[in-house]
Amino acid sequence: MEITFENVRDIIVETLSCDVEDIKLDTNLVEDLEADSLEIVELSMALQEKLGAGIEDEDLEKIHSVQDILDYIKGKQG
């Protein structure tokens, strides 16, 4: 599956049980969506499962926004 904002957004909505309208590129996972550390790990696992591109455990603390997720995954791919 291609790495797009829409694909990542849909995984976030499914994993964090939030509204699709709440997800923008600058949406902060913790501050805006109130995700805790366990939910961030679950999100990384869902990204790995559905997109084949998760976030390394040691890098999770660097991920704050949806844009961070996209940049990280695209950076790892190419």
Residue ranges, per PLM feature:
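Two-component histidine kinase catalytic core, primarily the HATPase_c
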Residues: E39
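Thiotemplate assembly-line natural product biosynthesis machinery
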Residues: M1-E21, G75-Q77
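C-terminal structural segments of small proteins and small subunits
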Residues: E61, Q67-I73
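Phosphopantetheine carrier-protein modules
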Residues: T15-E34, L51-K62
